[in-house]
Amino acid sequence: MSRHHRPFTWGGAQPGASFSNPTSPTLEASTFGFEPSVPDIYRRAWILVTKDASAELFADTSDADIHLGLLHKLLTSAGGLGPGSAEQIVNSACKGSRCSRSDFYCALGLLHQMQQGEELDVHLVQQRLTMGSLSAPVLDLSDATLNPHSHHTFPPTAPSGPSRIDPRPSTFMREMSDPWNANSSGSYNGIDTRPAYNQYDAMPQQYDTLNSHDSALPAGFAGNVSSGSFERIKFNAGDDRRSHQLLAHNQGSSTDTFLAPDRTEARARQPNTRQERPFSYMSDTAETNAVDAAEDPAADLPEDQVTVRLRSELEGFIIKHNVYIVSSSLRKSQVTRRYSDWLWLAECLVKRYPFRCLPVLPPKRIAMPIAGRHLSADDLFIERRRRGLERFLRMLTCHPMLREDKLVEVFFTEPRPIAEWKSSAPALFLDEEGLIKTVDEAERMSIPEDLQLKLTQQRQAIPELLERWTAMVALFERIVKRNDAAAADYSRLNFSLLSVIETSARRWRPGSDNGKKTEEIMSTMASIFQDHSDTTSSRVSAVSLSTLEGMKAQRDLILSFRDLIGRIDRQLVDPIDMLKKRIEASQKRITTLAASANSNSASIQQEQATLSAQVKQDTQSIQKYLNRRIHAKKTVWEELIWFHHRFKAVEEDMQKFVRDETFFLSTLTRMWEATEMKMKMIR
């Protein structure tokens, strides 16, 4: 199987991300070809500006995006340009709020043009980049010249020691806006989604996403906040305690929205090894059952951190396809999977567990290689799909029943490709769980008498809840994009002000004006603009990796219950009435044959035996389907409880968002106050 490198504009996998980083190059910058040949200085410069991120954030430095300030700093220090010339190159090469690798190479090509005294022509540089004929600019890449990254996070990282919540490795991948924008006429998990929503993230027209900002969200907490933005501010002890309290929000994963609301107590109760836990709610009456419903069925489950990363290489000889790296902390496994493997798993689960809340799969668009391009394989769509696949697996691992399924275990632990495993594995039996499991008396007693009333109430609320939640997610995402665009604009404002200072130094001034107060004030202003940009950029990453992704996970939860209701309506039908009528007809026929004059003949006795066997078989079938009805009721009741506790988990996410937003705004306030005091001291 041949492998080709992903297009050099691709923002691919980073190791171990709880939630991927919301960054991606703009579509205008994407080329979807193979990586062209560039001089070695281009790659060395790119590795330099991403070296701090490569070990922690990205599986491949080619997959990173960088802040515009890093490119500007490289051009002014290593490239020897003035602020005005560097600003001109940045604005020409980078049209969005981030700098992709293709933008970076284009900027270095423009730098070479400027060093040669040529007129800047971005189209010519892009053409040469595609053809692999770029020339090498003069760059001084010594470590003393460029220090591209700081080591600050937002909020600041707490010192080592016990924390309220165990921190997770902080790694990030790109995030895009998560309306899929895919008009799908198919069905997810067995339910046709066309009547209610024609798009995955359908929303009322008044909430249509604004297109005024061509923004791509920034690359993680670390590496965005400049050292100066926090070196200028001294935090008191109260601020330190405050930042320590907020540590859990950024180091944790917002996909914990599927965990218990009180995660601290849940983790304290977690055993080191898995324990069997009966998934039933025993009670004598519906009133007592309401007390049992207060217990979260997933509270004692050991936590499993699942990550899905996209490999930087495409596989396939003729038609290329993406390959994902799936990691599980609980199983200590790391395997490679294709989208078709998710599809296979979803189809198996919907056959085996039709009356459980199954996660939804993101849509798939067929990629056809045409003139070196892969249709529907743009960065935005692939990243949305990767995030959806990760949410799919996280929801599985948070479900008490689904996480223990053998096929789920195979998906997470089988080192071979699923297609190869299926060719050598025994035949799969995908019988519905209600047909092979017997409901005992205790489980029957766990079903509330008013289950139908509860389900009707849920059925009526779900459609409107899904519509409103989807609209809220889209609105919140618009806010995140605007903040990201504002961060980029503050950075560009810093570039412009530095250019003004450079030009202002050449203006005429009277001989008596020997002071440089004006330039110092403008320089201080430019510095606060960049600090504001860095801090806001980190905050955008924090919100995107936590609150926004948590909201999308909750939306998927609601959508999965809507699909469950659809399966209940379609599949909770059985042939019991037909079997009863056939039994009655067979019994009448047996009675008639017994009363006939030739009842002792061999043919009549043979017919009686056949009818008796048919009656026995139909009676067993009726018993099986009756057990299926009871099992379906028990399962639906369990899913109602599980959905309730998963939905309540949003409380903590919103509380953390408010706490972190307060810290962010207070940080900005202190930064501007410090700048005001510094300006007053300028003489």
Curated annotation (Swiss-Prot):
One of its GO terms (cellular component) is endosome. InterPro entries: PX_dom, PX_dom_sf, SNX8/Mvp1, SNX8/Mvp1_PX, Snx8_BAR_dom. Keywords: Cytoplasm, Membrane, Protein transport, Transport. PROSITE patterns: PX (PS50195). It is found in: Cytoplasm; Membrane. One of its GO terms (molecular function) is phosphatidylinositol-3-phosphate binding. Gene3D superfamilies: Phox-like domain. It is a peripheral membrane protein. The keyword Transmembrane does not apply. A 1,2-diacyl-sn-glycero-3-phospho-(1D-myo-inositol-3-phosphate) binds at R338, S340, K364, R385. Residues 248-257 have a biased composition (Polar residues). One of its GO terms (biological process) is retrograde transport, endosome to Golgi. It comes from the Eukaryota. Pfam families: PX, Snx8_BAR_dom. Coiled coil: none annotated. Residues 1-25, 246-276 are annotated as: Disordered. Its main location: cytoplasm. Residues 302-418 form the PX domain. Required for vacuolar protein sorting. The PX domain binds phosphatidylinositol 3-phosphate which is necessary for peripheral membrane localization. Belongs to the sorting nexin family. This is Sorting nexin MVP1. The gene is MVP1.
